[in-house]
């Protein structure tokens, strides 16, 4: 009989864990410095991800040893003190990596199996963002932290195939990758006594040269692969249209980009793989993107990456092993995830004893069973994955149709391949929900790691998130438990008490409600939906619920989840208990400096203007003086600045009674406020 989930870290003593956390922290900081600052990485992305995830897991398991300066609290950046800093106009996100066809196709089937996708070369170079205004290259900026980058414009201007002036006076922001061809790299490296390791490192270092004349001597090139046109009234419907526009604007794009249906992606990947070794430029994989822009908008983003794209990485490291057992775990959402326990193997310097099997469809497709000899690949996860079956076991493993934790009949949700336990009282679901709530990125309750929460649940101290706030009533009893001395109990209770001061913008996503993560929470707050009372009011009104679709980044799936979440009596009871416990149920106001005339106002800007070209300059001015930017007119919008071509936004504003200003009225307003806008734009 398969066993329940076991914690692979339980064999570590606290002393061993403390030492390992310190060692991993130092090692990761060293590699972050080499990668982001020196552009001289010494280990692969695989190995770095493994170290990072290992440290994250240990810190969650032993939170008492987490360091306030832990590298897991800091996002890596290539910012350099020698360059001016530039605030990106849009978040510069990364992509989620996949390492095999099965994983990618699982995402395709979940996203849009019949849709059209682009398949592009993933260039192995240095990421750059180009900003053009009225057809002129204004800024070239490194990705940096994703929000702020280094302005390396002078160096970027020296790259031969970057157009400095476009054939149209258009404003456009582009993502691109700076690289060198193998031929150019070999020739340049020969002249430099062979001191450069590879084209990628040389490209990254070249755009960070302090003297642009040195950059000009290096044979750099660029491919652009995505763009935003902020002022175009006619929006693009597909990524293919954007690609065509880039080519018309004389931007170089990755060659041989294919646009294929979801059913043809696997075949297309094989065709690309046949070409990769004969390419003249460095690539480390492919990028697969959903073609339909409206579908992208509906899917939206996480805080780190778009949901509508994936990176497909080449050449995962693989080794053979034997499956000893197959276990399965129940997550907080009820999802049941099987994993193979394998004979220990060494992959990229780490000992691997478990490998994920994803779901029953994946198991069936590969024909995985206990006793099988399989190939295991190192991936971007802490637990690698079974990729191939070399020698089958006696029979293909079947996940039991009942939850391993509570014995409830499992179900399949619409359009998903995973099995789920539907029982909200399932012990493993509840425990993992509490663990999620307490994690560092959520409510960050010190002293409560996985082990402590499992103990408290199993010994009837807590049975829900709300029970944490009654734990103080059992302090004396808890201190008598093994491993819970007075000091550790005081740390736990202090952490619980301090969590009451966490902003509502942390509380709401920490509840683990479907589709209500940090990104959606921020979108709601930005649009004035900043309290639980406001949310519950909307949940009772169908028209108000539908109006949420006006918020960019919120799609139909989020709306459906919103309705389901806030009509669930269990969730409503939890919210009520947390209210009574004293947690914050309204977002803290953003502090605005004195003399901010637009403070408390929400402005939308549309149309064209004589004094504000591009029109973003008007919005930047409003934000500078305390206003809030909104991209669509809704009942929460207080003002609309409308120029010629305003269209439907002006009609909507008039319907809702929003204050409308034309350009002359806006200039008069600025004059009355004694704002000299010409010195600011």
From Swiss-Prot:
Signal peptide: none annotated. Keywords: DNA damage, DNA repair, DNA replication, Ligase, Magnesium, Manganese, Metal-binding, NAD, Zinc. NAD(+) binds at residues 45-49, 94-95, 120, 143, 177, 289, 313. SUPFAM superfamilies: BRCT domain, DNA ligase/mRNA capping enzyme, catalytic domain, Nucleic acid-binding proteins, RuvA domain 2-like. It comes from Leptospira interrogans serogroup Icterohaemorrhagiae serovar copenhageni (strain Fiocruz L1-130). Residues 593-681 form the BRCT domain. It catalyses: NAD(+) + (deoxyribonucleotide)n-3'-hydroxyl + 5'-phospho-(deoxyribonucleotide)m = (deoxyribonucleotide)n+m + AMP + beta-nicotinamide D-nucleotide. The keyword Lyase does not apply. Transmembrane segments: none annotated. The gene is ligA. The active site is at residue 122. GO terms for molecular function: DNA ligase (NAD+) activity; metal ion binding. Coiled coil: none annotated. One of its GO terms (biological process) is DNA repair. Zn(2+) binds at residues 403, 406, 421, 426. Its cofactor is Mg(2+); Mn(2+). This is DNA ligase. SMART domains: BRCT, LIGANc. GO terms for cellular component: cytosol. InterPro entries: BRCT_dom, BRCT_dom_sf, DNA_ligase, DNAligase_adenylation, DNAligase_N, NA-bd_OB-fold, NAD_DNA_ligase_OB, RuvA_2-like. DNA ligase that catalyzes the formation of phosphodiester linkages between 5'-phosphoryl and 3'-hydroxyl groups in double-stranded DNA using NAD as a coenzyme and as the energy source for the reaction. It is essential for DNA replication and repair of damaged DNA. The keyword Phosphoprotein does not apply. Its EC number is 6.5.1.2. Belongs to the NAD-dependent DNA ligase family. LigA subfamily.
């Amino acid at each position: 009989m398969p066993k329940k989930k076991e914690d692979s870290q339980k064999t570590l003593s606290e002393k061993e864990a403390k030492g390992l956390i310190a060692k991993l922290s130092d090692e990761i900081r060293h590699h972050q410095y080499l990668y982001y600052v020196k552009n001289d990485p010494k280990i692969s992305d695989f190995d770095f991800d493994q170290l990072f995830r290992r440290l994250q897991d240990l810190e969650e398991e032993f939170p008492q040893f987490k360091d306030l300066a832990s590298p897991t609290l800091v996002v890596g950046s290539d910012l350099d003190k020698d360059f001016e800093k530039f605030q990106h106009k849009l978040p510069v996100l990364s992509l989620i990596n996949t390492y095999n066809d099965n994983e990618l196709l699982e995402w395709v089937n979940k996203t849009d199996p019949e849709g059209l996708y682009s398949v592009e070369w993933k260039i192995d170079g240095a990421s750059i963002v180009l900003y053009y205004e009225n057809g002129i290259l204004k800024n070239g900026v490194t990705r940096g932290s994703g929000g702020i980058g280094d302005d390396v414009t002078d160096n970027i201007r020296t790259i031969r195939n970057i157009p400095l002036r476009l054939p149209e006076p258009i404003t456009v922001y582009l993502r691109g990758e700076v690289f060198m061809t193998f031929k150019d790299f070999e020739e340049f490296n020969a002249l430099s006594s062979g001191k450069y390791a590879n084209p990628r490192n040389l490209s990254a270092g070249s755009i960070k040269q302090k003297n642009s004349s040195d950059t000009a001597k290096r044979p750099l090139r660029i491919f652009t692969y995505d763009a935003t046109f902020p002022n175009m009234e006619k929006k693009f419907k597909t990524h293919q249209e954007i690609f065509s526009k880039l080519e018309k604007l004389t931007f170089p794009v990755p060659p041989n980009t294919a646009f294929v249906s979801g059913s043809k992606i696997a075949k297309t990947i094989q065709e690309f793989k046949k070409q990769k070794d004969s390419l003249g430029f460095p690539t480390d994989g492919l990028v697969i993107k959903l073609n339909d822009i409206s579908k992208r908008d509906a899917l939206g983003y996480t805080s780190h990456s778009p949901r509508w794209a994936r990176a497909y990485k080449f050449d995962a490291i693989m080794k053979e092993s034997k499956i000893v057992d197959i276990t399965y775990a129940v997550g907080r959402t009820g999802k049941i995830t099987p994993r193979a326990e394998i004979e220990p193997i060494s992959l990229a310097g780490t000992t691997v004893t478990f490998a994920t099997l994803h779901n029953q469809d994946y198991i069936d497709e590969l024909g995985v069973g206990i006793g099988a000899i399989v190939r295991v690949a190192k991936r971007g996860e802490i637990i690698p994955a079974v990729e191939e079956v070399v020698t089958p076991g006696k029979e293909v493993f079947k996940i039991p149709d009942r939850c391993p934790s509570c014995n409830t009949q499992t179900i399949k949700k619409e359009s998903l391949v995973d099995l789920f336990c539907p029982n909200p009282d399932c012990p493993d679901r509840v425990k993992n929900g509490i663990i999620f709530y307490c994690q560092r990125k959520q409510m960050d309750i010190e002293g409560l790691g996985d082990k402590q929460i499992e103990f408290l649940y199993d010994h009837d101290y807590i049975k829900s998130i709300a029970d944490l706030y009654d734990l103080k009533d059992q302090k004396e009893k808890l201190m008598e438990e093994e491993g819970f001395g007075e000091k550790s109990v005081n740390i736990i209770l202090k952490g619980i008490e301090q969590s009451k001061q966490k902003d509502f913008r942390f509380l709401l996503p920490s509840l683990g409600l479907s589709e209500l993560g940090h990104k959606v929470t921020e979108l709601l707050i930005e649009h004035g939906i900043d309290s639980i009372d406001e949310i519950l009011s909307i949940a009772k009104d169908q028209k108000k619920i539908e109006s949420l679709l006006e918020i960019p980044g919120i799609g139909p799936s989020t709306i459906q989840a919103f309705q389901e979440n806030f009509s669930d009596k269990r969730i409503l009871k939890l919210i009520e208990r947390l209210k009574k416990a004293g947690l914050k149920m309204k977002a803290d106001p953003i502090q605005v400096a004195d003399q901010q005339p637009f403070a408390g106002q929400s402005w939308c800007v549309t149309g064209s203007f004589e004094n504000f070209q591009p029109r973003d300059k008007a919005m930047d001015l409003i934000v500078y003086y305390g206003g809030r930017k909104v991209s669509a007119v809704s009942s929460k919008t207080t003002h609309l600045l409308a120029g010629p071509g305003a269209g439907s936004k002006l009609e909507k504003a008039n319907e809702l009674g929003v204050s409308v200003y034309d350009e002359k009225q806006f200039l008069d307003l600025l004059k009355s406020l004694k704002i000299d806008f010409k010195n600011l734009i």
